[in-house]
A protein has these predicted regions:
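Residue-level detector of short, conserved catalytic/binding motifs and their immediate flanks
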Residues: 1, 8, 151, 169, ...
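Active-site-proximal structural scaffolding
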Residues: 3, 39-42, 46, 63, ...
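Hydrolase catalytic cores
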Residues: 3-87
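Residues that flank catalytic or metal-binding motifs in active/ligand-binding sites
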Residues: 6, 70, 149, 167-169, ...
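Acidic glycine-/aspartate-rich tracts in secreted/extracellular proteins
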Residues: 8-9, 79-82, 158, 178-179, ...
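Noncatalytic accessory or regulatory domains flanking protease catalytic cores in secreted, cell-surface
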Residues: 28, 34, 90-96, 170-233
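Secreted peptidase-domain scaffold signal
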Residues: 91-167, 224-226, 231-248
Length: 248
């Protein structure tokens, strides 16, 4: 999965025609509701969160978001689960049990619960100049943070339909003062620290990054067919917009 959401003992509406044994159990306070579970309960929660994210972009940012932007925003705000079954495969993000983690809206879009959370984005589905047309092409963006809070970055794109990844983009981050670098999904197992060749979502998460200016580079490592648009989301204690600084 890309994300997970609560799916155990969820209170749901009960059909008057369905026998009680089709559900997990009765809801004592109201006979029109029952307890249910599984992906049938988790999926509506994710859909509701996606609707809130879309509403945020339309109403607060005056932007019609692409599917990739909704996906990047939701994944960017996830919370990593540490229970044994959540990390049974491996304790790195992403894994086969929880993807990039559990949806957590307080970390997803600006809200009163997280007053220091700022969000900047690039959504290139209507910007031809920021769409990849060949392998080896790259775009660079710059932003600044004040420090003292976490930093999260998520890149997502809608790939061509196929059994495996077709257009491979890669995410790189650099702190301009120190020169320290990070790559997308660098916490995958085996410790290879190489660009991810398999996923159409890449994240960088820093718990206590130094203040200053940062450079993001997105590269088309392998582009079978273009143009390829993408969505980029950055959240944290941002002190500047996410500005385009290089197109090549």
């Amino acid at each position: 999965p890309d994300v997970v959401a609560p799916g155990t003992d969820i209170v749901s509406a009960k059909s008057s025609l369905a026998p009680l044994h089709n559900f997990w159990g009765p809801y004592p306070s109201n006979s029109f509701y029952v307890f249910m579970g599984g992906t049938s309960m988790a999926a509506p929660l994710v859909s509701g969160c996606a609707a809130l994210v879309r509403e945020y972009y339309v109403k607060e940012r005056k932007h019609q978001p692409s599917a990739a932007l909704l996906k990047a925003t939701l994944i960017n705000g996830t919370r990593w689960l540490t229970a044994p079954d959540a990390v049974a495969d491996h304790p790195y993000s992403p894994n086969y049990h929880q993807g990039f983690g559990c949806i957590y809206m307080p970390w997803t879009i600006p809200n009163p619960a997280e007053p220091t959370l700022k969000l900047e984005f690039q959504d290139t589905w209507k910007q031809k100049r920021l769409q990849f047309t060949r392998s080896g092409q790259r775009f660079r963006f710059q932003f600044s943070i004040s420090g003292g809070a976490w930093l999260r970055i998520c890149l997502a794109w809608t790939d061509l339909p196929a059994r495996a990844l077709q257009n491979n983009l890669n995410l790189f981050l650099q702190h301009l003062t120190s020169g320290k670098k990070w790559i997308g999904n660098e916490n995958l197992p085996m410790g290879l620290k190489i660009p991810d060749p398999d996923n159409n979502v890449e994240v960088v998460r820093l718990e206590n990054p130094p203040a200053g200016n940062y450079l993001i580079q997105i590269s088309a490592t392998n582009l079978l067919k273009g143009p390829q648009d993408f969505a980029l989301v950055v959240t944290g204690a941002l002190t500047s917009p996410l500005a385009v600084v290089s197109e090549r």
